[in-house]
Amino acid sequence: MPEHEPTDSQQSSDTVLMMIEAAARSGSWNMATDEYLLEAALSGGLKAVRMYRWEQPTVSLGYFQDSDDEALSTTFQKLAAVRRLSGGGAILHHHELTYSFVIPADDPLTQLPTELYGRVHKAIIDVLRDFGADCS
């Protein structure tokens, strides 16, 4: 896995762990790993970006989404399903690269969402380029 050093504008405390999982995993594995990373961010200050894939078509439901919704049941009845820690609606995962990121709740970047997402997306683009992808 390529290593990425902090940019000049970042301090050493802003180092972010980049995790790229080669093997596709089950939805329950992916959500459990995301939960573990979130707990590590909250309790130990971890900053991480994780890139991963799904081993089978899986629908992930948002944290507050009603899993008994009849439209969801009909549409996704034959698929594996998991619940995300984040909100939002149902997402069908298959043949994709998914990412998650965690930072401590008291990190100043939590108050600057545009800059936070910009940094995360730049890090992902840098990693993809390291692997030969043509992206911007």
What are these regions (language model features)?
Residues 1-2, 78:
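Generic secretory/membrane-interface signal
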Residues 2-72, 83-84, 134:
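Active-site loop/lid in soluble adenylation, ligation, and acyl-transfer enzymes
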Residues 33, 95, 120:
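Catalytic-loop motifs flanking and including active-site residues across diverse enzymes
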Residues 48, 78-80, 89-90, 112-113, ...:
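Short, surface-exposed, polar/charged, turn-prone segments marking secondary-structure boundaries
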Residues 51, 76-77, 121:
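Hydrophobic alpha-helical segments and their boundary regions
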Residues 69-109:
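A glycine-rich, hydrophobic loop/mini-helix early in the fold
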Residues 98-136:
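Contiguous, small/hydrophobic- and glycine-enriched helical/loop subdomains that border
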